């Protein structure tokens, strides 16, 4: 429960002192304390510009300015893996904690919510 600005001093996302040749992250969560709880690459023409992007679910803890979960990001990772653009999905639901995202064989996206015990099917508009 350490404030993010303090925690980063002790727990950098990539420790370049210990691992100077490590690949730097293409994206980070802006210092927020939200655990990534599952991700999947989106497959299927029905997703249009999102096909091939990474869907990531979060389980935020709601302290030090960090929102609770109920968030899915769609990451467009560059071909060289050195950068990414983020698009946040807006959910017309309660504040839950998304625990996992998954695709079925038809390319439908499913999201598991810890608070409600529900699994939501997400389809493109």
Walk through the language-model features, giving the residues of each.
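Beta-rich catalytic cores
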Residues: 35, 97, 115
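Beta-propeller domain segments
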Residues: 1-87, 106, 122-125
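Blade-level signature of beta-propeller repeat domains, shared across WD40, Kelch, NHL, RCC1
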Residues: 102-125
């Amino acid at each position: 429960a350490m404030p993010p600005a303090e925690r980063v001093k002790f727990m950098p996302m990539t420790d370049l002192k210990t691992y100077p040749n490590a690949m730097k992250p293409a994206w980070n969560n802006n210092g927020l304390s939200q655990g990534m709880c599952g991700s999947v690459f989106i497959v299927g023409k029905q997703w249009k510009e999102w096909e091939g992007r990474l869907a990531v679910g979060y389980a935020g803890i709601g302290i030090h300015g960090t929102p609770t979960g109920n968030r899915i990001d769609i990451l467009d990772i560059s071909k060289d893996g050195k950068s990414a653009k983020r698009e946040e999905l807006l959910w017309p639901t309660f504040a839950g904690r998304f625990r996992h995202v998954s695709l079925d064989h038809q390319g439908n996206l499913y999201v598991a919510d810890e608070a409600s015990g529900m699994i939501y099917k997400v389809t493109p508009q």
